[in-house]
Curated annotation (Swiss-Prot):
Subunit structure: Binds DNA as a dimer. Can form homodimers or heterodimers with other AP-2 family members.
Segments of this protein annotated with the region H-S-H (helix-span-helix), dimerization: 276-405
One Pfam entry name: TF_AP-2
Function text: Sequence-specific DNA-binding protein that interacts with inducible viral and cellular enhancer elements to regulate transcription of selected genes. AP-2 factors bind to the consensus sequence 5'-GCCNNNGGC-3' and activate genes involved in a large spectrum of important biological functions.
GO cellular component annotations of the record: nucleus
Name of the protein this chain belongs to: Transcription factor AP-2-epsilon
Record-linked PANTHER family: TRANSCRIPTION FACTOR AP-2, TRANSCRIPTION FACTOR AP-2-EPSILON
Polar residues composition-biased segments: 79-93
Localization of this protein: Nucleus
Lineage summary: Eukaryota, Metazoa, Chordata, Craniata, Vertebrata
Disordered: annotated segments: 1-108
Ranges spanned by the short sequence motif PPxY motif, renumbered to the chain: 50-55
C-alpha cells in the first residue's frame, strides 16, 4: 500500500484545478503540512454508486487512464467522470435521433406531445400491454416515456387504448349496462294507446279496490280497479300524473306517496315518470273509476226508461202545433225516429275496452278509435248515457206519433158528425 500526501502531488497535464488533489495542492502548505496521509485501495475494491436503468453498471466504462507523472495511482473519482461522459453521449445521440426523425407521427399528435421536449433519462414502460397506437408510440423518437411519468397516467392510456381512442381528454370509459332499466324499456315499447310494457302483467288482474265517491254512507260500495284500467288512465288522452292517479285511487297523501305509487306500478310493468303533466282537462268524471262510471250510467238509463215523462212532453208539443201542419209534423217525426234509431244502433256497436274486458271491434278502425277516445275520457259512462238519453227521446217520438194519429182520427170523426147533423 502506497501512502502519499496531497501536498506533494502535481498533475502533469495542468488540470490540477479540476481534480480534488489539484485543489488541495493549491492551498497553503504550512497550514496542511501535518495532514494525515490518505490511503488508496486498489480499483477492484472500489464500489461505484448504483444507478437505475438506462444506465446499467455493466455498460459504464470506468476510465483507468493514468497521469503521466503518477502511473501507479488510479483516478480519485473515476465513476463520476465516466458517468458524466456517458450522460453527454446519450444526450447527443438522443438529440440527433430526434432531429432526424422530424415531426411526430399522427399518434403523437393525438396525445398532444411536444416534439421539442426530450426525455433521455426516462425508460420506456409498458409498451407491450397497450394497443396499436401505444405500440406506435413506443417505436417513435420519444417513446412511451414522453406521455406521462405517473402510474395513474399510464393506466389512463391503457383504458384509452382499450376503447380504441388516443385522445387524452376528459372523456371517460363508461361501462354499457347489461340490460335496460324499466324506464328505457317502457320508452321502447310504448304503444299509441298507453304506457303498457312488453312485460306488463295480466290486464284483468285486480290492482286495488276503491270506495265509491257518489254512494251514500249507508250503501258504500267498493269498485275493483284492474291493471288494464290503470294502464288506460296513464295512457292518452288523460295521461294522469302521480298526484291525480293517487286521487283517483283514493290513496292517502304522504311525503313519499308518489314514489311509492311509481314503485308499485313498476312491479306490474307500468312506468309513471316523475314531473309528468296531465294532457286532458280535469272534470268530475276524472275522479270516477270505470266501475263507478258504468254503475252511474246504468242507473241513469234505468231512471230515463222508467221516469222520463215522454207522454206529457208529447202532448204539450202537439197542442202547440197548428191543425193544418199536423201532416207535415207527422212526417218529420217519422224521419227523426229513423235517424235516432240509426244512431242508437251505431252506439250499441261500440267495443271500447272497459274494466277487464277487451271485446273484438266490429266497426271500422276510424270510427272505433273515435268512440274509444270518448269512452276513455268518460271511463265508460258516455256511450251508455247517450243510449239511455236517446231511448228516452225515442219514447217521446212514439208518444207524439200516437197523439197525431189520435188527433187525426178524432178530427175526422168530428167532421162526420157535423155532416150528419146538417142532413
Amino acid at each position: 500500500m502506497l501512502v502519499h500526501s496531497y501536498s506533494s502531488m502535481e498533475r502533469a497535464d495542468g488540470l490540477s484545478s479540476s481534480s480534488p488533489g489539484g485543489r488541495l495542492s493549491q492551498l497553503n502548505q504550512a497550514a496542511y503540512s501535518s495532514a494525515p496521509p490518505l490511503c488508496h485501495t486498489p480499483a477492484s475494491d472500489f464500489q461505484p454508486p448504483y444507478f437505475p436503468p438506462p444506465y446499467p453498471q455493466s455498460s459504464l466504462s470506468y476510465s483507468q487512464s493514468q497521469d503521466g507523472g503518477y502511473p501507479h495511482l488510479p483516478e480519485p473519482y473515476p465513476s463520476l467522470n465516466s458517468l458524466h461522459q456517458h450522460q453527454q453521449a446519450a444526450w447527443h445521440s438522443q438529440r440527433s435521433r430526434s432531429e432526424d426523425a422530424g415531426l411526430l407521427s399522427q399518434p403523437h399528435r393525438a396525445l398532444s406531445l411536444d416534439p421539442r421536449r426530450e426525455y433521455p433519462g426516462v425508460p420506456r414502460l409498458l409498451t407491450h400491454g397497450l394497443g396499436d397506437g401505444a405500440a406506435a408510440l413506443g417505436d417513435g423518437p420519444l417513446g412511451m416515456h414522453a406521455v406521462h411519468h405517473g402510474l395513474d397516467d399510464i393506466q389512463g392510456l391503457e383504458e384509452a387504448s382499450a376503447l380504441g381512442i388516443l385522445d387524452h381528454s376528459v372523456i371517460k370509459k363508461v361501462p354499457l349496462p347489461s340490460k335496460l332499466n324499466g324506464s328505457t324499456i317502457s320508452a321502447l315499447s310504448l304503444s299509441k294507446e298507453g304506457l303498457g310494457l312488453g312485460g306488463v302483467s295480466n290486464p284483468a288482474e285486480v290492482f286495488c279496490s276503491v270506495p265509491g265517491r257518489l254512494s251514500l254512507l249507508s250503501s258504500t260500495s267498493k269498485y275493483k280497479v284492474t291493471v288494464g284500467e290503470v294502464q288506460r288512465r296513464l295512457a292518452p288522452p288523460e295521461c294522469l300524473n302521480a298526484s291525480l292517479l293517487g286521487g283517483v285511487l283514493r290513496r292517502a297523501k304522504s311525503k313519499n306517496g308518489g314514489r311509492c305509487l311509481r314503485e308499485r306500478l313498476e312491479k306490474i310493468g307500468l312506468n309513471l315518470p316523475a314531473g309528468r303533466r296531465k294532457a286532458a282537462n280535469v272534470t268530475l268524471l276524472t275522479a270516477l273509476v270505470e266501475g263507478e262510471a258504468v254503475h252511474l250510467a246504468r242507473d241513469f238509463g234505468y231512471v230515463c226508461e222508467t221516469e222520463f215523462p215522454a207522454r206529457a212532453t208529447a202532448e204539450y208539443l202537439c197542442r202547440q202545433t197548428e191543425p193544418d201542419q199536423l201532416p207535415t209534423r207527422r212526417s218529420m217525426l217519422l224521419a227523426t225516429k229513423e235517424i235516432c234509431k240509426e244512431f242508437v244502433d251505431l252506439m250499441s256497436q261500440d267495443r271500447s275496452p272497459l274494466g277487464a274486458s277487451r271485446p273484438t271491434p266490429c266497426l271500422e278502425p276510424g270510427v272505433q278509435s273515435s268512440l274509444t277516445h270518448f269512452s276513455l275520457l268518460t271511463h265508460g259512462f258516455g256511450t251508455p248515457a247517450l243510449c239511455a238519453a236517446l231511448s228516452a227521446f225515442q219514447s217521446y217520438l212514439l208518444e207524439a206519433l200516437k197523439l197525431l194519429d189520435k188527433g187525426e182520427n178524432g178530427g175526422k170523426n168530428h167532421h162526420d158528425k157535423e155532416l150528419k147533423h146538417r142532413k
